[in-house]
Every structure is written in structure tokens, then in C-alpha cells.
């Protein structure tokens, strides 16, 4: 979810998730906490692990709400480009409700901690009526 730039595609994914949950069943979506990412944004990041160097360059498209990322793994020169929709928490709630979910809530961790600006994740919890 979120790796498609078009809202219609992402809402279609949520509707399919809704259809797969039994009535009364619960649904969880683990997503980026976009406010935290924007707050600590670094466009260029290099990580070294197990003899590999992973370079990530990220460009923000604030007008469209997208993060364009280029990943490079060396040695090997593997390059991959990805685009992630930078949904704000309130947008996730709106999309889940449009898909038919109710009792939508947001938490900041799998332990159920409150969603805050510094939370690393934004986890949406919802129910199919």
C-alpha cells in the first residue's frame, strides 16, 4: 500500500482488504509516519552492512505528496527506483473510511503507543462492520 502514486489505486487496495476481512473482523495497516520523516528528512543516506553499501537518495514532491527514492547497492551496482505516496495520518483515516472500515484509530507502534510526531510508524487499526 502506498507504492502506487494514484489515490484510486491505493483506495482499490484498501477496498480489497475490506472485502477480505470478515464482518466484525479487524484490519491493521503499518505505514510510514510521514510527519516524522519530513521532520528528520535526509535526502541522501549511506548504510554499510555485511560488506555491502546501500545508498538511498530521496526527492520529495510536496505538490503531489510523493517521495521518489533511488536505491543503489554496491558492490554490484544494482539500482532501483521507487515512489511512495506520502500519506499524512488523517489521509489514511479518510481512505480507510472510504473503503468501508469503521472504528478507525491510529497508533505509533505495534505495542499500541499513541501516535506522536516522533513515532517511527503510523499504524492504522480498523474494523469491518
Which ranges hold each PLM region?
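Conserved short-loop catalytic and cofactor-binding motifs
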Residues: 1, 80-83, 111
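Glycine-centered flexibility sites
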Residues: 2, 24-25, 108
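SAM-dependent methyltransferase
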Residues: 7, 28-95
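A short glycine-rich, Lys/Arg-flanked "PGG" loop and its adjoining helix->strand segment in the class I
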Residues: 11-26
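A short hydrophobic/small-residue beta-strand
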Residues: 27-28, 103
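C-terminal lobe and adjacent flexible extensions of AdoMet/dcAdoMet transferase-like proteins
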Residues: 87-129
